[in-house]
From Swiss-Prot:
The gene is yokE. The lineage of its organism: Bacteria, Bacillati, Bacillota, Bacilli, Bacillales. It comes from the Bacteria. This is SPbeta prophage-derived uncharacterized protein YokE.
Amino acid sequence: MGQKFHKLNSKYGIIDYPILLKDLESIIQEFPKSERKFYEYAIKALKKEVGKKEKILHMTSADPKLTKFGFMVITEKKLLFVTMKGGFFGGADTEVVEFKSIKEVDFDIAPNPLGMATMQLGILHLKIKGKLGMSSKRTIRNIDEHSLDKIVAILREQTK
């Protein structure tokens, strides 16, 4: 575990991908308690979808739906969106998108007319195969601009 995570200070750290889900469980113990709860909910939901030997290629916070926040997780086999539930008990839901159903990957940086942003400005655009030959467009917002290029490169490589 020591090789996969480098803690810079109480707020920042660097994760060396790819990692396994069990590695992520031990890494989050280094996060502040208030932030750790979101990761615990996400890991609990991911355990139902990600195999024990399946590698996580990248994980980042994102807004998978317009009004919901959560995480975007890229594994060797699929793309997962983890959406946080609201309410008293909390928790998380997962949505799986198979790489073979992704037709197109594109990105953008949100314009910010007011100066400094209070959120991340990266936007990911996916065109996903639907039923009966139709395709749907999916927009994922609030992605860190610094990791956007890496995410796009991984997704394009996996969808070839």
